[in-house]
Amino acid sequence: VDEWYINMDWRKKIKKIVDEINWIPEWGQEREHEWLDNMGDWMISKKRFWGLALPIWIFEDESYYVVGSKEELKELAVEGWDEFEGNSPHRPWIDKVKIKHPESGLIGKRVEDVGNPWLDAGIVPFSTLKYNTDKEYWNEWFPAEFVVESFPGQFRNWFYSLLAMSAMLEEKAPFKNLLGHALVKAEDGRD
């Protein structure tokens, strides 16, 4: 199955902001560094219907174009904008938009893939704290003061996606303090 990946040649940026965080317990910092040192490229796509629509359009010559904003999408759109406008940027509305490649002039359609859920999780601060629309509000609430989460799995999932997005977009940590705990179980020992 073909998937989409982000080349992680910028992991040093992520490692730098890992060191800005107060990790409780302290070994969490080392664990995150180990993950970053040993990870491959980041698979960002899934073969699903619902999810974060990847902003990638593909053309008949198999070239592709990544659209950088809603404004750019509107500018490039040659079909389907009226059906899309006013709806959320998800399927089926986003898939109605066809664009003209700014260099080749070919008409393309969006790839059917959606984003990996952890890619989506990494942009939560950006999508909920008005990153694109109210910088004063954004600066008041970002970075978060405190995150509490179970350690198992989150080093390569939620923490990683938050760190990656923040490193790329803001070049600073998405939270100041992280309290990690073991898996919490029910009284009878079930997860």
What are these regions (language model features)?
Residues 1-191:
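Structured secondary-structure scaffolds
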